[in-house]
């Protein structure tokens, strides 16, 4: 059996969960370190890559491919792009304490055990335990920039004009 495992980076779409926070608190934040650079990928790029590989069937045995998005960004950098894209130049990123993030998740309806796993994930990302295993290359870099994602997906969702991607 031929299997290709795709290991996608941090989804750009994860940032959509902060829209209500931006509206309500005027800040963007989570438990990630502000200056830790992360590869961020649009889910559309993952789907496009998977579809192309299934059409080509150019893999054999068991293989893994990391998909790292267009470039690495820190949460501070991503917030600056979001700020420009939604017309809120003063928007800033704030790293929240783990206990506050866990409490917020459970208040949003996330089961406590799942919220605890999110905190474990944030801690592992911040510590470098969860990180890309391959260096960035032409093969694992995808086309959608964070600016394009904000323009096409985040800003319309923020302004209540979301369309299907």
Ranges and model annotations:
Residues 1-92, 100-108, 112-114, 164-165:
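Oxidoreductase cofactor-interface core, primarily capturing Rossmann-like NAD(P)-dependent enzymes
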Residues 95:
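Conserved strand-loop elements at the edges of beta-sheets that form or border functional pockets
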Residues 98-165:
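A hydrophobic C-terminal alpha-helical subdomain
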């Amino acid at each position: 059996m031929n299997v290709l495992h795709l290991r996608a980076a941090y989804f750009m779409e994860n940032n959509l969960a902060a829209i209500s926070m931006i509206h309500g608190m005027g800040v963007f934040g989570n438990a990630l370190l502000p200056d830790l650079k992360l590869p961020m990928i649009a889910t559309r790029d993952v789907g496009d890559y998977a579809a192309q590989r299934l059409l080509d069937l150019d893999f054999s045995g068991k293989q893994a491919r990391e998909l790292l998005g267009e470039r690495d960004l820190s949460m501070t950098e991503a917030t600056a792009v979001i700020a420009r894209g939604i017309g809120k130049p003063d928007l800033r990123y704030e790293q929240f304490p783990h206990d506050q993030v866990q409490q917020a998740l459970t208040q949003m309806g996330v089961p406590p055990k799942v919220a605890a796993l999110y905190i474990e994930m944030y801690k592992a990302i911040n510590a470098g335990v969860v990180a890309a295993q391959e260096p960035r290359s032409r093969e694992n870099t995808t086309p959608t920039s964070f600016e394009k994602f904000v323009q096409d997906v985040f800003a319309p969702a923020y302004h209540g004009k979301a369309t299907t991607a």
